[in-house]
Amino acid sequence: FGGGVLMIHFSHVTKTYEESWKALRDVTLRIRKGEFVFLTGHSGAGKSTLLKMIYMDERPDNVRGGQVMVRLGDSVYDSKTSPDNSIQGFRRKMGVVFQDFKLLPDRNVFENVAFALRIVGKKPKEINAAVFEALALVGISQKRFAMPYTLSGGEQQRVAIARAMVHNPYLLIADEPTGNLDPKNAEEVFAIFKEINARGTTVVMATHNPDFYLNSPFRRLELKQGELLNKEIL
């Protein structure tokens, strides 16, 4: 990894699914600590598969030495050597936000955000402090007792972001997080991601919205049919 700066390293990563469909084709990339990186490409280009490699939901094919390495703090995940039973603990050092929110429908906003902390046995005082900080970050503290079904799409996505950030992750992964939102809410959610990055968290965001990346200073990695197009900016 060298110097502790490199957080994510893909080396010749290919992923094949049934009927020889290659979701990723010989992808090599590097993402450094503190970066904000866009992942773009049409539907089916391989964006979600690439993100799944980062949060260890998939492993590369065993061809050309395909390997994914992710360093979060003092922990290193290696797709070749890390056992499955080590992955859950490693994932707790990152946050993941999806397009469809994935909130618990029978729990209020506060409990949705607190859920992951309760699972790992955090004390109530610690949970309260962390949840209030996360809700303040996304600007939804006033809705902490609301049930998900009473919230707008933009509000639900804010709750999902708060849940992903409640344990202060090193890395935030977002898979089309504004895909179900109107332009105003999408822009507000994007502003939250920029603030999260400004506070030091590395952000990798898959999006098909050119309004975000065309005039942005952040690096963009573009996929087409599983191949990384702009290899020269790695």
Q: What annotation goes with each model-predicted range?
A:
Residues M147-L151, E155-Q157:
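Conserved ABC ATPase signature
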Residues R107-F115:
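Short coil-to-helix segment of the ABC ATPase nucleotide-binding domain corresponding to the Q-loop/switch region
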Residues Q67-G89:
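ABC ATPase NBD Q-loop/coupling interface
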Residues T40-H42:
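The feature captures the beta-strand-to-loop junction immediately N-terminal to the Walker
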Residues V166-Y170:
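A short, proline-enriched helix->beta-strand linker immediately N-terminal to the Walker B motif
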Residues L172-D175:
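Catalytic Walker B motif of ABC-type/P-loop ATPase nucleotide-binding domains
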Residues Y55:
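Helix-to-loop junction immediately C-terminal to a conserved catalytic motif
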